[in-house]
Amino acid sequence: MNILADALLPGLDSAFPPPFTVTLYHKADEIPELLHHKDVLLCRSTLKINGDLLKHHQIKVVATATSGTDHIDFPFLESQNISIIDAKGCNATSVADYVVACLAYLDKQQLIQGKTAGIIGLGQVGTKVYERLNAAEFQLCLYDPPKATRDTSFQSCSLEDLLECDFLCVHAELHSNAPYPSLNLINRDFLKELKPGCIIINASRGGIINEEALLHLGSAILYCTDVYNNEPHIDNRIVSRATLCTPHIAGHSLEAKFAAVAIVSRKLHQMLGLPYPQFATPEKPYRLNDDSNWRELALSIYNPIHETLELKHAGNLSSAFLTLRKNHHHRHDFTTYFDSDSIKKYPLLG
């Protein structure tokens, strides 16, 4: 079976041994020519999967090595009987680390007013964030009405409850499905009711927050974001407005990238009735001593202000966004730096 895969994905050789043959693409404009006689397209969330890309090809499977699937035109793929494989949950730990790093920076700058936190979206990422904040004894408001309809043991708070929070963590999937669409969920009416000094950390998708409404709100609300409308052609006004702004890398730890490929590989092998291969894993980093506080430990591993300043000072914002995202490849999950005793001491770290 012939696979065309994004060259930036790690561990492809071990994840797809014979009978698979892997060809790599480095840029999206290489795909139309390389896709001939391929059975599987293995991509990342940066590639739009639709009829324009695939209409002249006869592939059988689209596999995305990412949790999010809003870059995929599902109706088109279904109309062509093309199977879809995703890697949901692959980067949940990495995104939770990112949120903690943002909180570490904000707390160090004395910008966090209290310990009441709202989490929007309780999928695998939101649940990871919840577990850490709960272990660190934050007061939590959990907003996920669709989850409440599926899981009778879960009770969602209301949007009004979120207005009392000191900070909000956004982890919902982007969709427009009634009765609880996430598209433009955080709009002008919601934003203007937040208490002054409230912090929003968006590590989901740009379209959940109405960027125009945010821009017209003034500076009372602090905005920290990893995601934007129209990536990579992001709005320079949002970058200027944001306290922290990073190039969509929250889920880009080395462990998350390897896990994404492994999850896709397992699903494809299972689909074809093949035994699982041995998967490559990233080399473990050196251990850190826990003789500092949680803020310094988190920021010693990843400090979001560095990429924030790179974006804010960029001449060509789109180019800087893509370059920074591509070069973000040395971060490990926080838990790989500590033993279990250190994690018990500082539960926000893992």
UniProtKB/Swiss-Prot annotation:
Active site per UniProt: 205, 231, 248 (proton donor)
Q: Which GO terms describe its cellular component?
A: cytosol
Which species does this protein come from? Legionella pneumophila (strain Lens)
**Record family assignment:** Belongs to the D-isomer specific 2-hydroxyacid dehydrogenase family. PdxB subfamily.
Q: Name one GO biological process term.
A: pyridoxine biosynthetic process
Where this protein primarily resides, as one coarse class? cytoplasm
GO molecular function, one example?
glyoxylate reductase (NADPH) activity
> Which top EC class is named for this enzyme in its record?
oxidoreductase
What are the alphabetically sorted keywords of the record?
Cytoplasm, NAD, Oxidoreductase, Pyridoxine biosynthesis
Catalytic activity annotation: 4-phospho-D-erythronate + NAD(+) = (R)-3-hydroxy-2-oxo-4-phosphooxybutanoate + NADH + H(+)
Q: Which domain of life is it from?
A: Bacteria
How does the annotation summarize its subunit structure? Answer: Homodimer.
Identify the pathway: Cofactor biosynthesis; pyridoxine 5'-phosphate biosynthesis; pyridoxine 5'-phosphate from D-erythrose 4-phosphate: step 2/5
Task: State the protein's name.
Answer: Erythronate-4-phosphate dehydrogenase
What is this protein's function?
A: Catalyzes the oxidation of erythronate-4-phosphate to 3-hydroxy-2-oxo-4-phosphonooxybutanoate.
- Which residues are noted in the entry as substrate-binding? 45, 66
Say yes or no: keyword Transport present.
Answer: no
Annotated NAD(+) binding sites: 124-125, 144, 203-205, 226, 251
For this protein, the Enzyme Commission number is 1.1.1.290
Cross-referenced Gene3D superfamilies: NAD(P)-binding Rossmann-like Domain
Q: Which gene encodes it?
A: pdxB
Subcellular location(s): the record lists:
Cytoplasm
